[in-house]
């Protein structure tokens, strides 16, 4: 009689999703995530903020100047120009002054609506202005609450951003040179963290500070650093971080290739690509910070 083979039969347990419970919960979770994102966007305006790279630095300089002369926030003026789709050719100090005259006397944002009605009583226009103001708040964060990077002594500078340079190959100047005496104290323009410190062939002894506003502030050609300052340290606005010099354009320790000065650069993160950071013209900001610090030459 042949042997009987037995095969063990095991039952596989099947798990089924209770659709009546799962899908409503999934839908609620998705709605919660969407609402959280929208709330963050509404609070921060992240979806709409203009980057510094999107704004003409000459226009920005003009708006800052009109604010200083008339006491009207620069972003009100720029927001009106954008709401009216004013072309680049039409933007001018004269137009900015006229807009400021309509808005003079504003002491709080709540008064803006009434002033705008006197200028243009179109509800859609007023909403557009308010929307554009929100989009400009990131730039205003960079603009406000800063100090000039050179201590109050004799110095000179001009708008030499973008000028050609030849050392190390044909390139463009990515900052502003502030000519000053050797050893002039250099200041952190804002609160932030020391991100880079050390030698670069082009920049010599340099220090890079990531401001709390997200901008990378680049100081080059130093003669020396402030004692005890290291990468990762937090710095406060107005804190001495180093001293102007003439280092750079060669191997480590090279000096004397040019007159003492501070090369001051600003770099903005490109949040929409992996391109890294883009050099921004610091000139309009330097003029405004200098004026605010009472150092205007």
Predicted region positions:
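N-terminal Lys/Arg-rich, disordered targeting/topogenic segments
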Residues: 1-20
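Hydrophobic membrane-insertion alpha-helices, especially the h-region
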Residues: 23-39
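Export/targeting segments at the very N-terminus of extracytoplasmic proteins
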Residues: 41-86, 142-148
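Acidic, glycine-rich catalytic/binding loops that coordinate metals and/or anionic ligands
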Residues: 146, 230-231, 236, 257-297
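Zn2+-dependent peptidoglycan hydrolase active-site motif and core
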Residues: 188-230, 250-261
């Amino acid at each position: 009689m042949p042997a009987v083979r037995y095969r063990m039969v095991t039952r596989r347990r099947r798990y089924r999703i209770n659709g009546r419970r799962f899908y409503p919960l999934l839908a609620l979770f998705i709605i919660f995530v969407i609402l959280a994102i929208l709330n963050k966007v509404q609070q921060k305006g992240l979806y709409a903020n203009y980057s510094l790279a999107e704004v003409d630095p000459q226009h920005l300089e003009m708006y800052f100047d009109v604010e200083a002369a008339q006491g009207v926030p620069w972003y009100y003026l720029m927001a009106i120009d954008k709401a009216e789709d004013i072309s680049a050719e039409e933007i001018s100090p004269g137009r900015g002054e006229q807009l400021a005259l309509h808005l003079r006397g504003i002491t709080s944002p709540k008064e803006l609506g009434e002033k705008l009605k006197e200028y243009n009583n179109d509800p859609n226009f007023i909403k557009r202005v308010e929307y554009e103001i929100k989009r400009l708040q990131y730039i205003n964060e960079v603009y406000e609450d800063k100090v000039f990077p050179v201590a109050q002594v004799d110095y000179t500078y001009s708008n030499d951003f973008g000028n050609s340079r030849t050392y190390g190959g044909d390139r463009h100047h990515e900052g502003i040179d502030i000519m000053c005496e050797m050893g002039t104290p250099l200041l952190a323009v804002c609160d932030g963290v020391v991100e880079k410190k050390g030698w670069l062939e082009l920049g010599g002894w340099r220090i890079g500070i990531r401001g709390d506003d997200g901008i990378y502030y680049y100081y080059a050609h130093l003669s020396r650093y402030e004692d005890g300052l290291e990468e990762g340290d937090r710095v406060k606005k107005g804190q001495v971080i180093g001293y102007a010099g003439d280092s750079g354009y060669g191997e480590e320790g090279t000096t004397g290739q040019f007159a003492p000065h501070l090369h001051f650069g600003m770099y903005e993160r490109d949040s929409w690509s992996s391109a890294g950071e883009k050099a921004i013209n610091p000139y309009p900001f330097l003029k405004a910070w200098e004026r605010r610090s009472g150092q205007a030459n």
